[in-house]
From Swiss-Prot:
This is Probable protein kinase UbiB. Belongs to the ABC1 family. UbiB subfamily. The chain crosses the membrane at residues 30-47, 489-507, 513-530. It comes from Azotobacter vinelandii (strain DJ / ATCC BAA-1303). InterPro entries: ABC1_dom, Kinase-like_dom_sf, UbiB, UbiB_bact, UbiB_kinase. Is probably a protein kinase regulator of UbiI activity which is involved in aerobic coenzyme Q (ubiquinone) biosynthesis. CDD domains: UbiB (cd13972). It is found in: Cell inner membrane. Keywords: ATP-binding, Cell inner membrane, Cell membrane, Kinase, Membrane, Nucleotide-binding, Transferase, Transmembrane, Transmembrane helix, Ubiquinone biosynthesis. Residues 126-490 form the Protein kinase domain. It is an enzyme of class 2 (transferase). One of its GO terms (cellular component) is plasma membrane.
């Protein structure tokens, strides 16, 4: 084992002892009873405790901060997994600050010049060596292009990949050991949690990916009064350097400044909710890191306020099927139709097909009824989704990364909205949007567009069906995947019948006595594509 890795392990161990995290580690059901009992023999467990010792959640947060940027980022990711963590720990981890000392400006300049293949004074009319901000992954410098535009230059912290690889190796080791020793750890899929983190952190290291995300989000809201996204200057973007328009706005948490400029806080809060649902249901592409540090408010027209979003390193998206099931789930909640909520979870494949609907419905009712007894303005949309996911986990709900990101984003938007306007009624804002979206989705135009999309797949239908059948026949194919493929095969069959019916109808007059096969194929195809879904409602 390399000396640096050993030193890092000793460093982690010393932090665990200093912050008495043995309480958190050895008192949890993640470890078997014999290992928890062994933990009580550790010498420092018998040392007297200070009266002023802080709660376990605070100690964990301080320890993660002490261990450095990679563990800070991991803690931030963990804070979104409220289905895994006790509430006090999840709440405390949201306070983790991703602020670290800046690295040497000379290193920053050298990296920029290496990436751009040009000297800084050749690329920019002005470059401020003193950074505007510094975080665990990158730091930001102000600059001006030769053409006069004010920009910011984001630079990835040098040497970060080596640190990430080392810390990830230890995180994977700890997660695997816990899963081998404990059924509870296996249920929580700790290795998968680390794997999700690995993907997130490496995605954030690729600034071209972040630039592409920002460009997509800007295009989605081009000309919108709701949201402004700074322009990306692609000629100066590289994997480790991003150049974008410099924005000037009021931090969304600076309520005093927003009030001073006469901002309509109620409208601002409602627009935050509208932005969220527009991203999720209209665009199926949402900014998944909308914490207050990444959101500003334009100083123009405070009576008609506009958000400004930066840092698009983490984004999420939903498939059309996930969009549909999510919208119908939320509308069923509005009606307190818990049986429909339970059935939708089964139909979507989020929980196993053999789940007892009656038992699942009863569990959902037990969680939701106390919440719905509150006034609508006091109900937390994000907390409701969280409680639902926690309940579904008891019924072996498979972790859906896209839904975890969505729930985290919703909690951020909802919390932000109620800081701006405590009387915000998120339900009143959301329900009309969802109903409009569902009506539009079931409109003749939408069905025609869907038919066109299915017809475009017709030349590939035979190969797609063959591939699906080969996959489903594999011994390792699990039940959940089999259910999803069954659903996919039925849609393929529906598309084939619909396309065949259309082609047959073009050759046979619809009033002819020989037209019945085309009508039968059209009706069967429509049933498989649309009717089955509506019947499940």
């Amino acid at each position: 084992m390399k000396l640096l890795a050993v030193r890092r392990l000793l460093r982690i161990q010393s932090v665990v002892v200093r912050y008495r995290l043995d309480d958190l580690l050895f008192d949890q059901p993640l470890l078997p009873w014999w290992l928890r009992a062994l933990g009580y023999l550790l010498p420092w467990r018998w040392l007297p405790r200070r009266r002023s010792e802080q709660p376990r959640a605070v100690r964990l947060r301080l320890a993660l901060q002490d261990l450095g940027p990679i563990f800070i980022k991991f803690g931030q990711i963990l804070s979104t997994r409220r289905d895994l963590l006790p509430e006090d720990i999840a709440d405390e981890l949201t306070w983790l600050q991703d602020r670290v000392p800046p690295f040497n400006p000379q290193q920053s300049v050298a990296l920029i010049e290496e990436q751009l293949g040009a000297r800084v004074d050749e690329a920019f009319a002005r470059f401020d060596s003193e950074p505007l901000a510094s975080a665990s992954v990158a730091q930001v410098h102000a600059a001006q292009l030769k053409t006069g535009e004010e920009v910011v230059v984001k630079v990835v912290r040098p040497g970060l990949k080596a640190v990430i690889r080392q810390d990830l190796a230890w995180l994977y080791l700890f997660a695997r050991l816990a899963e081998r020793a404990s059924t509870e750890a296996r249920r929580l899929h700790l290795v998968d949690v680390v794997s999700d983190y690995e993907k997130t952190i490496y995605d954030e290291l690729d600034l071209l990916r972040e630039a592409a995300n920002a460009s997509q989000l800007k295009r989605n809201f081009e000309g919108s009064p709701l949201l402004y996204v700074p322009q990306i200057y692609w000629d100066w973007c590289r994997p480790k350097v991003l150049v974008m328009e410099r924005i000037y706005g009021v931090p969304v948490t600076d309520l005093a400044a927003l009030v001073d400029q006469g901002t309509d806080l109620k409208l601002l809060a409602e627009r935050g909710v509208e932005i969220f649902f527009t991203q999720v249901f209209r665009d199926s592409f949402f900014h998944a890191d909308m914490h207050p540090g990444n959101i500003f408010v334009s100083t123009r027209q405070p009576w008609d306020p506009q958000y400004i979003a930066i840092d698009c390193g983490i984004v999420g998206s939903l498939t059309p099927q996930d969009q549909d099931y999510l919208a119908r789930n939320l509308l069923a909640f509005f009606k307190r139709d818990y049986r429909k909520v339970a059935q939708l979870h089964i139909d979507s494949g989020w929980v196993p097909a053999d789940t007892q609907v009656n038992e699942f419905e009863a569990a959902i009712r037990t969680v939701c009824e106390p919440i719905f007894e509150k006034p609508l303005k006091d109900i937390s949309f994000g907390q409701l989704l969280l409680r639902l996911f926690q309940t579904a986990r008891r019924f072996n709900m498979e972790v859906q990364p896209q839904l975890v990101l969505l729930q985290k984003t919703l909690l951020n938007i909802e919390g932000l909205g109620r800081q701006l306007y405590p009387e915000l009624d998120l339900w009143t804002t959301a329900k009309p949007f969802l109903e409009r979206w569902m009506r539009k989705r079931m409109s003749p135009k939408a069905m025609l567009d869907n038919l066109q999309g299915q017809l475009e797949q017709l030349p590939h239908l035979a190969q797609m069906t063959r591939t699906a059948l080969e996959d489903i026949s594999r011994p390792a194919w699990d039940t959940r995947k089999r259910e999803r493929h069954d659903h996919h095969l039925l849609r393929l069959l529906g598309a084939a019948l619909l396309a065949g019916g259309v082609l047959l109808a073009l050759q046979t007059p619809p009033t002819s006595a020989n037209a019945w096969p085309s009508w039968l194929m059209l009706a069967s195809g429509l049933y498989l594509l649309v009717g089955r879904r509506r019947l499940s409602d």
